[in-house]
Amino acid sequence: MVSLDPEKKNEIIKEFQIHENDTGSVEVQIALLTARIKHLTEHLRKHPKDFHSRRGLMKMIGRRRKMLKYLRHKKPEVYRELIAKLGIRK
């Protein structure tokens, strides 16, 4: 799986964390997955036959979809703010 560089990861965590020590809330996890998905999508545009990476991308998208579904049911307002901030829904 493709990982983000530590500076980019810390920047995303600081932007989406709920409190100072928050690194694992659903919002942060979704934001990190979205960044990894965008990075891997760019990779697959350059390397369209990389099917192993494509499978990893599909797994990440599925994991993000499940987390978004959970967030939509538990905290609908936070869900709407998050998708608007990330620009992942219409």
Curated annotation (Swiss-Prot):
InterPro entries: Ribosomal_uS15 (IPR000589), Ribosomal_uS15_bac-type (IPR005290), uS15_NS1_RNA-bd_sf (IPR009068). The keyword Acetylation does not apply. Pfam families: Ribosomal_S15 (PF00312). Keywords: Ribonucleoprotein, Ribosomal protein, RNA-binding, rRNA-binding. One of its GO terms (molecular function) is structural constituent of ribosome. SUPFAM superfamilies: S15/NS1 RNA-binding domain. Transmembrane segments: none annotated. SMART domains: Ribosomal_S15. Coiled coil: none annotated. It comes from the Bacteria. The keyword Ribonucleoprotein applies. One of its GO terms (biological process) is translation. GO terms for cellular component: cytosolic small ribosomal subunit. PROSITE patterns: RIBOSOMAL_S15. Part of the 30S ribosomal subunit. Forms a bridge to the 50S subunit in the 70S ribosome, contacting the 23S rRNA. Belongs to the universal ribosomal protein uS15 family. NCBIfam families: S15_bact (TIGR00952). One of the primary rRNA binding proteins, it binds directly to 16S rRNA where it helps nucleate assembly of the platform of the 30S subunit by binding and bridging several RNA helices of the 16S rRNA. Forms an intersubunit bridge (bridge B4) with the 23S rRNA of the 50S subunit in the ribosome. This is Small ribosomal subunit protein uS15. It comes from Thermotoga maritima (strain ATCC 43589 / DSM 3109 / JCM 10099 / NBRC 100826 / MSB8). The gene is rpsO.
